[in-house]
Amino acid sequence: MASGAGGSWGRSPPQSAVPTPWVTFLQPLSWAVPPAPPQPGRVKEDLLELMMLQNAQMHQLLLSRLVAGALQPRPASPCPQVYLEVPQEEPEEEEEEMDVREKGPLVFHHHYLPYLMPSPGALLPWPAPFFPTPACQPYLQDVPRIQHCPASREREVRAVPPPPPPSATGTVGADVPPASDYYDAESLL
């Protein structure tokens, strides 16, 4: 910041004088000590020190905001007041509203989907009476039910095959016949 050619702040410099531009030279300083290479055990200590510094700064910031908030005066009411401008209604609209009010209050019905309830015995930590639901009311009302219809007479009804022979279960011995002797080929059809 030059004060001009004459050394006075109030006057403008004469037109013949050319202002000298500022020049910045960046030169490495040879006498500066290079930083020591980080030692293996020192990195953790430096990181811990940095974290403690950040923690102290955050603590200081929070406390300063808390003090600033406590010192500032607060409004009389805890919440801001909101004023709405309501347009003036015409008498015809007021009569319509009165007719609606005379008919009765509005009723809103809320419909909730049923949900499965877990067994209350496993969730309750204290002894509580367990009241099972009545047999006439299922837990879920709109759950699809399985209906068993009698088989049509067109299909031939087969009997359920017998259980596997002992030889199929690995219990073959001298007194147990093999599976081929146990089953009769005609009984399976």
Swiss-Prot record:
Annotated spans, Disordered: 152-189
InterPro entries the record matches: DUF4587, PRR29-like
Superkingdom as given in the UniProt entry: Eukaryota
Pfam families assigned to the protein according to its UniProt record, in alphabetical order: DUF4587 (PF15248)
This protein's name: Proline-rich protein 29
Species name: Homo sapiens
